[in-house]
Each structure stands twice: as C-alpha cells, then as structure tokens.
C-alpha cells in the first residue's frame, strides 16, 4: 500500500497539546457551549478576520445555518436554486432542501471532481 497521509504522524506531532485540551473540556463538564467553545469561536473569528463565529456540530448544521441566514436577510427565497457538484455529500443537499431551496446538481470534471464555470453557466436558467 502506498501511504498517502499518515494521520497518526500528524496527530502524534500534537499529541500532548490535544490530550491536554480534551482533558480540560472533559474535566469542565461543558462539552457544548462552554468556555472552550466560546474561546474557539472568538479565536477563529479573529483568525479569519471577521467579527463573529458560530461553532457547529457538523457540516450539515453549518450549511443549514448559512442558508437560513441568507433567507432571513432576504438574500435568498423559497425555491431559489443552489448549484452544487453532483458528487457532493448528502449534507450539502439537505442543508439546501431543508431550507426550502432547490439543489441543482452539476457534473464535475472527472480528473479534478470540480465543476467548471461553463457548467455553472449552463445550470443557470435564462
């Protein structure tokens, strides 16, 4: 087998720091919405140069929230279409459809698995 990425090596590089962080959270009894979450949200917001950050439990939650926010802000409305690669994970589709939006699947390139501008243009209705 050809090793692609040894996650064990990557993890071992940060073993003590990771173990200490996990132990702090476990000992605090706050697994969600505690000080560690607040600190992460603050630090990550600063890192990416924005004022706010909301930690999410998974990608679906994050996608659901952003599409809901777009609807609340009037950027999107029920039935609006969202173009996604046909090989996307189901959470992408559910985050869209669970907000009353319509996913539009576009076939990706075989060599990169990405969609290209011309395919996006074809998927946009006139």
Ranges and model annotations:
Residues 1-30, 35:
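N-terminal "arm"/small-domain region of PLP-dependent enzymes with the aminotransferase-like
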Residues 71-126:
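PLP-dependent aminotransferase-like
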Residues 6, 55, 84:
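Small/polar loops that bind or transfer phosphate-bearing groups
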Residues 30, 35-81, 95-99, 105:
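Phosphate-binding glycine-rich loop
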Residues 10, 61, 89:
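Short, solvent-exposed loop/turn segments at secondary-structure junctions
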């Amino acid at each position: 087998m050809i090793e692609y990425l040894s996650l064990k090596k990557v993890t071992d590089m940060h073993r003590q720091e990771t173990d200490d962080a996990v132990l702090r959270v476990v000992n605090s009894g706050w697994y969600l919405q505690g000080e560690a979450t607040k600190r992460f949200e603050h630090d990550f917001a600063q890192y990416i140069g924005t004022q706010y950050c909301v930690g999410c439990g998974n990608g679906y939650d994050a996608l659901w929230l952003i599409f809901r926010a777009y609807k609340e802000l009037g950027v999107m409305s029920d039935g609006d279409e969202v173009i996604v690669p046909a090989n996307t994970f189901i959470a992408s589709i559910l985050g869209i459809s669970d907000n009353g939006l319509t996913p539009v699947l576009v076939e990706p390139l075989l060599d990169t698995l990405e969609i290209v501008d011309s395919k996006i243009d074809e998927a946009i209705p006139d």
